[in-house]
């Protein structure tokens, strides 16, 4: 590729780069990437015909200002051809999600959703809440919009199907039923108060209910209740009655719960000014599993159908779509989007904009929620902007900070020490940008808070220098708040000086003489401490940020400490890997029971040879 004319304007140079690429492009479908001079991905797009689509960028006067800026920054392009337009759409969605290009419409707050898991790696399956990678063997049901929705459903499932929720190690160690059996929340399979075939039948009923066959399950239970009543088995009939009530209670707690919709997502978009909100409601098994609001970024100047198409592609990039998606408006290239989602799901996925009935009412309800959420967001954003302007005035900054980072440490006499960083900006807390730092230094004295802060800031800003040297990726703070007084501030200033950073404002925030809130003092380099009156809104705002950093640090420390506590004495045994450890815990129920076991008992464990059993026994009984 020849270099663009260096004397031309940036926009003209970008157009020239794109024009040179257009000459080499085929008419086939594919995905293209616009790259900056540093190789950063600016934009990812897909096309039915690469040549016809990319040539449009050589006429930037017809493009939104955002895309014109992207063209001006384009120094090169990368192109991948695909067999079909559907394949191009799937690749585009995955690339946007993984790369986060600066000029694409982005779904920034796409957190993982909790699911319900029925395990399949134990003779007596367990039902539990699950979030994260699906590493455990079993069947997953969801998504649920919140942990609360999962907990509510799990409670009903326990009442209706009496399935165990305890861990495998607890299950193996039980000698008598637990409290859940007494209050009719479990059938006590741990001590075989129920036949295994009967228990597995309950598991199948729960699986059917969660798979969308709720009405069939309830109908079967009703028939069995009536049959028991006719046979004058009133105690059995009462049990079936209670199980039916538990299942109907799930639906009774829903705000909106249509009879016709078994498995669907309802997606509604509301646009006002430069703001966009997309509400997603999840319906599974005829139940409302809750909803979440999304606020796509870089959507200014885009039409609603384009935003909807971009959202659907990214939202389902790492999720299995339901059989039906109800929409408030038709996305761009709806047939291609539907085909792509169907290929991803391995079955037909229907996209529709309902015109009447329950489905239309569901979409209207979701749209009302999207409108209200966007209104609240815009009001909060205006208030947040005023607070940030107040922060700038308080600390003598030239403009309101776009990114504030707050740092705190947590430890117990130096053990399991962690550092924490939280981030806030014009849209509030940016939880996806939070970071935790396990303190690695081995030469720190216990409780050396200054040394811990130096390590945290050194790692944080050295990485920023490496990953965003030109500071155009939004990774650098305008203001860094340090939880502590003059000493912590000086430690932080020393770190930045060593790294050659002199344009990030550092402020220490310390509680008053009696460590009481409302008398905080703010420490700046070379200045006397600043105080605000106890009811000042900027003080309240900064207190909230400090408290959020403290909460995050404490939570991170507790998680690390708990992880250390659960490591049993089996971890110190030579020759005992994860598989043997699991077999021992599964057989005996606890590390203490393993330590107290005799040699014949150890030999009876699957995967433990006579030699290994003797080694384990000798380890715990060195006296013989």
From Swiss-Prot:
Domain UVR positions: 215-250
Origin superkingdom: Bacteria
Compartment annotation: Cytoplasm
Keywords: Cytoplasm, DNA damage, DNA excision, DNA repair, Excision nuclease, SOS response
One of the GO BP terms on file: nucleotide-excision repair
Domain GIY-YIG: 27-105
One Pfam assignment: UvrC_RNaseH_dom
One CC-aspect GO term: excinuclease repair complex
Major site of localization recorded for this protein: cytoplasm
Record-level Gene Ontology MF annotations: DNA binding; excinuclease ABC activity
Protein purpose: The UvrABC repair system catalyzes the recognition and processing of DNA lesions. UvrC both incises the 5' and 3' sides of the lesion. The N-terminal half is responsible for the 3' incision and the C-terminal half is responsible for the 5' incision.
Family stated for the protein in its record: Belongs to the UvrC family.
Subunit structure: Interacts with UvrB in an incision complex.
Protein name: UvrABC system protein C
Organism of derivation: Paramagnetospirillum magneticum (strain ATCC 700264 / AMB-1)
């Amino acid at each position: 590729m020849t270099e663009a004319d260096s004397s031309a304007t940036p926009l003209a140079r970008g157009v020239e780069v794109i024009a040179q690429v257009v000459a080499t492009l085929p008419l086939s479908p594919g995905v293209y990437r616009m790259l900056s001079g540093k190789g950063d991905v600016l934009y990812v797009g897909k096309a039915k015909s690469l040549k016809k689509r990319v040539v449009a960028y050589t006429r930037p006067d017809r493009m939104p200002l955002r895309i014109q800026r992207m063209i001006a920054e384009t120094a090169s392009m990368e192109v991948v051809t695909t067999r079909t337009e559907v394949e191009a759409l799937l690749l585009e969605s995955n690339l946007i999600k993984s790369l986060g290009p600066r000029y694409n419409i982005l779904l920034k707050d796409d957190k993982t959703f909790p699911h319900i898991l029925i395990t399949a790696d134990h003779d007596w399956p367990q039902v539990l809440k699950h979030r994260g990678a699906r590493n455990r063997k079993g069947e997953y049901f969801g998504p649920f919009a919140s942990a609360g929705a999962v907990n509510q459903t799990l409670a009903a499932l326990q009442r209706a199907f009496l399935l165990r929720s305890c861990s495998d190690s607890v299950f193996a160690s039980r000698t008598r039923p637990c409290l859940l059996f007494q209050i009719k929340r479990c059938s006590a399979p741990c001590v075989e108060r129920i036949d295994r075939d009967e228990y597995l039948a309950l598991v199948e009923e729960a699986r059917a209910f969660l798979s969308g066959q709720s009405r069939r399950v309830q109908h079967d239970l009703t028939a069995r209740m009536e049959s028991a009543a006719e046979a004058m088995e009133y105690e059995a009939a009462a049990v079936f009655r209670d199980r039916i009530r538990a299942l109907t209670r799930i639906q009774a707690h829903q705000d909106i719960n249509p009879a016709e919709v078994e498995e669907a997502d309802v997606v509604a978009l509301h646009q006002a000014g430069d703001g966009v909100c997309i509400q997603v409601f999840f319906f599974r098994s005829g139940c409302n599993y809750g909803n979440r609001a999304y606020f796509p970024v870089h959507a200014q100047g885009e039409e609603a159908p384009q935003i909807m198409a971009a959202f659907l592609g990214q939202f389902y990039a790492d999720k299995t779509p339901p059989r039906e998606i109800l929409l408030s408006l038709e996305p761009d290239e709806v047939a291609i989007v539907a085909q792509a989602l169907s290929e991803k799901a391995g079955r037909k996925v229907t996209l529709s904009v309902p015109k009447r009935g329950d489905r239309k009412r569901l979409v209207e309800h979701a749209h009302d929620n999207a409108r209200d959420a966007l209104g609240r967001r815009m009001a909060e954003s205006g208030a947040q902007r005023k607070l940030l302007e107040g922060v700038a005035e308080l600390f003598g900054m030239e403009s309101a900070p776009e990114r504030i980072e707050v740092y705190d440490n947590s430890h117990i006499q130096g053990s399991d020490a962690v550092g924490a960083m939280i981030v806030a900006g014009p849209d509030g807390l940016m939880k996806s940008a939070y970071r935790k730092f396990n303190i690695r230094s081995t030469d720190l004295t216990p409780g050396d808070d200054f040394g811990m802060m130096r390590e945290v800031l050194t790692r944080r800003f050295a990485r920023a220098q490496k990953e965003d040297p030109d500071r155009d990726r939004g990774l650098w703070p305008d203001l860094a708040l340090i939880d502590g007084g003059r000493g912590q501030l000086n430690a932080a200033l020393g770190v930045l000086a060593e790294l050659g950073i002199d344009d990030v404002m550092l402020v220490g925030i310390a509680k008053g003489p009696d460590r009481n809130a409302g008398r905080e003092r703010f420490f700046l380099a070379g200045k006397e401490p600043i105080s605000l009156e106890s009811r000042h809104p900027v003080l309240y705002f900064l207190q909230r940020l400090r408290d959020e950093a403290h909460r995050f640090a404490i939570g991170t420390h507790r998680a690390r400490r708990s992880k250390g506590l659960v490591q049993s004495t089996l971890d110190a045994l030579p020759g005992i890997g994860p598989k043997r450890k699991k077999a021992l815990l599964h057989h005996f129920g606890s590390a203490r029971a393993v330590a107290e076991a005799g040699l014949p008992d150890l030999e009876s464990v699957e995967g433990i040879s006579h030699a290994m059993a003797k080694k384990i026994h000798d380890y715990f009984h060195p006296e013989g």
